């Protein structure tokens, strides 16, 4: 989808010689903008750490602490090593979703390449963790408990794991792209009245989609750590 109302659309011309489409250029530019913004925010929040947090430090500690608590509740204490990955994905997706509610900004998660990249990161991490934790025994996760059904179960499990990438990609992309299309249409019809309820709903959708993606990522990684039966 090519967004007609963007502040940074001049980057399209700069990235076109590199083979980027207009929609792809928008996603790349705003992805980098969000990453830089998150890095700057992190540096600002941790520049002068205090025992009793206040201001930006307090705000970030609430967010990070909430993500950590959810991770421990879902994966247990042994899930803490995966906190950096889970928190990074959650914050990036949440900010990517929310930035689309600001007129003139494009949500990278409304581009399927962005959501596919996040899904592939979860998929690859899941199986690297599984192999690292179980070694060659990780293959048992794909064979099932009955030996003579193992070939069929292997095929079914492989399809099931690949479908996770597709579901993670399309769920996030479909919701954010659809909402963006609705906002564009309503902004064209009634720029100052009709979009307001949709933008409020967009805030809710943004948080829900980030939460669902984060939760599924934790569940998939946790599944790779469990012993096959």
From Swiss-Prot:
Main location: membrane
One Pfam family cited in the UniProt record for this chain: ATP-synt_A
Bilayer topology: Multi-pass membrane protein
Gene Ontology biological process terms, A to Z: proton motive force-driven plasma membrane ATP synthesis
Molecular-function GO terms, alphabetical: proton-transporting ATP synthase activity, rotational mechanism
Transmembrane segments: 25-45, 82-102, 104-124, 142-162, 181-201, 202-222
CDD domains for this protein: ATP-synt_Fo_a_6
Gene3D superfamilies: ATP synthase, F0 complex, subunit A (1.20.120.220)
Keyword set, alphabetical order: ATP synthesis, Cell inner membrane, Cell membrane, CF(0), Hydrogen ion transport, Ion transport, Membrane, Transmembrane, Transmembrane helix, Transport
Compartmental location: Cell inner membrane
Top-level division of the source organism's lineage: Bacteria
NCBIfam families: ATP_synt_6_or_A (TIGR01131)
Function: Key component of the proton channel; it plays a direct role in the translocation of protons across the membrane.
Listed PANTHER family: ATP SYNTHASE SUBUNIT A, CHLOROPLASTIC
Protein name: ATP synthase subunit a
Species for this entry: Geobacter sp. (strain M21)
Underlying gene: atpB
């Amino acid at each position: 989808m090519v967004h007609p109302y963007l502040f940074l659309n001049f980057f399209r011309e700069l990235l076109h010689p590199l083979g980027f489409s207009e929609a792809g250029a928008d996603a790349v530019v705003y992805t980098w903008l969000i990453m830089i913004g998150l890095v700057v925010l992190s540096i600002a929040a941790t520049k002068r750490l205090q025992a009793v947090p206040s201001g930006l430090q307090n705000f970030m500690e609430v967010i990070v602490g909430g993500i950590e608590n959810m991770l421990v509740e879902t994966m247990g204490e042994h899930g803490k090593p995966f906190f950096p990955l889970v928190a990074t994905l959650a914050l990036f997706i949440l900010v990517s979703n929310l930035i689309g509610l600001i007129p003139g900004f494009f949500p990278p998660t409304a581009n399927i390449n962005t959501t596919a990249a996040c899904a592939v990161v979860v998929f690859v991490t899941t199986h690297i963790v599984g192999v690292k934790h179980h070694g060659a025994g990780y293959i048992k996760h794909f064979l099932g408990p009955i030996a003579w059904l193992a070939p069929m179960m292997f095929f079914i499990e492989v399809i099931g794991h690949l479908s996770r990438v597709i579901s993670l990609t399309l769920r996030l992309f479909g919701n954010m792209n659809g909402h963006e299309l609705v906002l564009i249409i309503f902004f064209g019809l009634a720029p100052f009245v009709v979009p307001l309820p949709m933008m409020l709903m967009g805030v809710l959708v943004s948080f829900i989609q980030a939460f669902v993606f984060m939760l599924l990522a934790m569940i998939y990684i946790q599944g790779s750590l469990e012993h096959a039966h």
